[in-house]
């Protein structure tokens, strides 16, 4: 597990992206944004199935997109983006006011 302070700062930066930037949630829309070359960073939850994770890594490698592995599960990632449901993967298209692209990648 990541230290609590760094995990909280990541959650804050992610919340700022949700408020001011553009993003997509979920596997299908993330793969679509990766194939179109629109994604700048993808965040994958820790409990994502191995096959799905490897497919996301493959598409990210093809589109030269950075990958960040979130320390919590999909419940925690859903809470971090302010949703009341589980989120396995988040694709950040535009960071907005956040410096998450330089910090995480």
UniProtKB/Swiss-Prot annotation:
It holds the Pfam family Ribosomal_L7Ae. Its main location: cytoplasm. Gene3D superfamilies: 3.30.1330.30. InterPro entries: Ribosomal_eL30-like, Ribosomal_eL30-like_sf, Ribosomal_eL30_CS, Ribosomal_eL8/eL30/eS12/Gad45. There is a cross-link at residues 22, 53, 83 (Glycyl lysine isopeptide (Lys-Gly) (interchain with G-Cter in ubiquitin)). GO terms for molecular function: pre-mRNA 5'-splice site binding; RNA binding; structural constituent of ribosome. Keywords: Cytoplasm, Isopeptide bond, Ribonucleoprotein, Ribosomal protein, Ubl conjugation. The keyword Ribonucleoprotein applies. The keyword Cytoplasm applies. It is found in: Cytoplasm. GO terms for biological process: cytoplasmic translation; negative regulation of mRNA splicing, via spliceosome; rRNA processing. Component of the ribosome, a large ribonucleoprotein complex responsible for the synthesis of proteins in the cell. The small ribosomal subunit (SSU) binds messenger RNAs (mRNAs) and translates the encoded message by selecting cognate aminoacyl-transfer RNA (tRNA) molecules. The large subunit (LSU) contains the ribosomal catalytic site termed the peptidyl transferase center (PTC), which catalyzes the formation of peptide bonds, thereby polymerizing the amino acids delivered by tRNAs into a polypeptide chain. Component of the large ribosomal subunit (LSU). Mature yeast ribosomes consist of a small (40S) and a large (60S) subunit. The 40S small subunit contains 1 molecule of ribosomal RNA (18S rRNA) and 33 different proteins (encoded by 57 genes). The large 60S subunit contains 3 rRNA molecules (25S, 5.8S and 5S rRNA) and 46 different proteins (encoded by 81 genes). Belongs to the eukaryotic ribosomal protein eL30 family. Present with 59300 molecules/cell in log phase SD medium. This is Large ribosomal subunit protein eL30. It comes from Saccharomyces cerevisiae (strain ATCC 204508 / S288c). The lineage of its organism: Eukaryota, Fungi, Dikarya, Ascomycota, Saccharomycotina.
């Amino acid at each position: 597990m990541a230290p609590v302070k760094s995990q909280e700062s990541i959650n804050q930066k992610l919340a700022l992206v949700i408020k001011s930037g553009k993003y997509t949630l979920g596997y299908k829309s993330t793969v679509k944004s990766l194939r179109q070359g629109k994604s700048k960073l993808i965040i994958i939850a820790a409990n994502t199935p191995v096959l799905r994770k490897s497919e996301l890594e493959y598409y990210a490698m093809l589109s030269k997109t950075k990958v960040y592995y979130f320390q919590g599960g999909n419940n925690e990632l859903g809470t971090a983006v302010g949703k009341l449901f589980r989120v396995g993967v988040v694709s950040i298209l535009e960071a907005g006011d956040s410096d998450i692209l330089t910090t995480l990648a």
